[in-house]
């Protein structure tokens, strides 16, 4: 007959102490290595005094850094306004998305319906029954603001204007455009068709960053189709050699609107002005915003995608340490000559235990400029840590028990 003995902590203590003696030394290592502080490339300079942002003759405006997403100036940024042909930024974005995913190609021949041909307002001048390449229609949408081209692509991608508008709204929600609702792909007036300066800046940032190989189209100054040459309506392209996008808009209700972007050195800004009095005014007001941003701010690259920002202790895995970093390059926009005030604080989840997948969120990073929080990012596992073998897991369990006990006793 087998006799079982009851568990006794006193009997187990020598075993546990023996295990502890084997693993105590490794436990003296830190839970994680200190995080590297931001090392901006800019050299220290005397601090620049930052004036208040310019006041514009417009209903709403916003100035955003395309790299960091930081807002540098704004006025009524969330007011719901008619966007006019700024709507076509979403139309073009969805075409670019379909191209990027391989669902369509630039050479696809799009049949032109009578509905597309009859659409009023600005035109590319396509004809009923023509078959026009996607590449030509995309140019027609972006450069000459063709309503006919916009409807043709809506029909090609979604089967009609209404289902395409539904897709537009789904993507607006996905991108965080909280004050936007689209009814058509053109921007022709409708009471329930609206957007905001903030939402349009956010959309433009995605156009620039998500599909960069298509972005050069926004800087082209003219477009010819069917023997008809038309200029790009964005006159800022002629005024500022650093400007390279994006889109104009006008209706009587919307006024004269412009979403523009310019890049100087490594800094790219996006300016949105809505509700100005003339085509000249929208250019001048946009220039004021861009000049303010480039004069008084700078965008610094703090960390590279995939750079190891922290090495953290992992329990019960096939390795004892986990490399931690960020998913994308980290940019921060700060007032000029204050880069030395940047600090980063990493908060790694305590008690990381295998298995851990590459790309799994394991903590967060907070970037401060002095006492101001200027950015937050998720911290991800840069590698996979698989579950360790039986004895490795048992040793780590004992090790962790004593580590927690030691921390509880001695803080």
Region spans (language model):
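Structural motif marking the loop-to-transmembrane transition
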Residues: 9, 83, 134, 387, ...
């Amino acid at each position: 007959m087998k006799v079982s003995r009851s568990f006794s902590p006193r009997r187990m203590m020598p075993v546990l102490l023996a295990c502890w003696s084997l693993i105590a030394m490794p436990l003296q290592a830190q839970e994680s290595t200190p995080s590297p502080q931001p090392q901006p490339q800019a050299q220290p300079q005397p601090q620049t005094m930052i004036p208040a942002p310019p006041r514009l003759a417009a209903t709403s405006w916003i100035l955003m850094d395309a790299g960091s997403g930081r807002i540098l100036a704004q006025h009524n940024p969330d007011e719901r306004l008619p966007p006019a042909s700024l709507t076509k930024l979403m139309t073009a974005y969805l075409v670019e998305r379909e191209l990027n995913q391989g669902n369509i190609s630039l050479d696809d021949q799009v049949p032109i319906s009578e509905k597309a041909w009859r659409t009023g307002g600005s035109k590319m001048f396509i004809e009923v029954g023509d078959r026009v390449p996607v590449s030509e229609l995309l140019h027609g949408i972006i450069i000459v603001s063709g309503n006919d081209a916009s409807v043709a692509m809506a029909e090609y991608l979604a089967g009609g204007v209404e289902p395409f508008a539904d897709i537009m709204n789904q993507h607006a929600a996905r991108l965080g455009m909280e004050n936007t609702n689209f009814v058509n792909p053109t921007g022709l007036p409708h009471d329930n068709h609206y957007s905001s300066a903030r939402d349009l800046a956010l959309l433009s940032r995605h156009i620039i960053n998500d599909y960069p190989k298509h972005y050069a189209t926004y800087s082209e100054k003219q477009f010819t189709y069917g023997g008809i040459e038309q200029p790009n309506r964005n006159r800022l392209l002629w005024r500022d050699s650093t400007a390279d996008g994006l889109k104009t808009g006008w209706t009587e209700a919307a006024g004269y609107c412009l979403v523009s972007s310019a890049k100087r050195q490594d800094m790219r800004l996006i300016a949105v002005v809505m509700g100005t009095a003339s085509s000249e005014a929208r250019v001048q007001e946009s220039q004021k915003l861009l000049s303010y941003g480039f004069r008084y701010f700078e965008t610094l690259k703090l960390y590279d995608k995939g750079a190891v920002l922290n090495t953290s202790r992992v329990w019960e895995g096939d390795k004892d340490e986990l490399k931690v970093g960020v998913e994308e390059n980290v940019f921060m926009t700060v007032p000029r000559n204050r880069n030395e005030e940047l600090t980063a604080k990493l908060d790694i989840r305590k008690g990381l235990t295998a298995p851990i997948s590459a790309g799994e969120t394991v903590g967060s990073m907070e970037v401060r400029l002095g006492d101001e929080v200027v950015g937050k990012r998720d911290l991800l596992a840069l590698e996979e840590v698989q579950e360790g073998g039986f004895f490795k897991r048992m040793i780590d369990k004992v090790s962790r028990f004593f580590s927690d006990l030691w921390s509880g006793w001695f803080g």
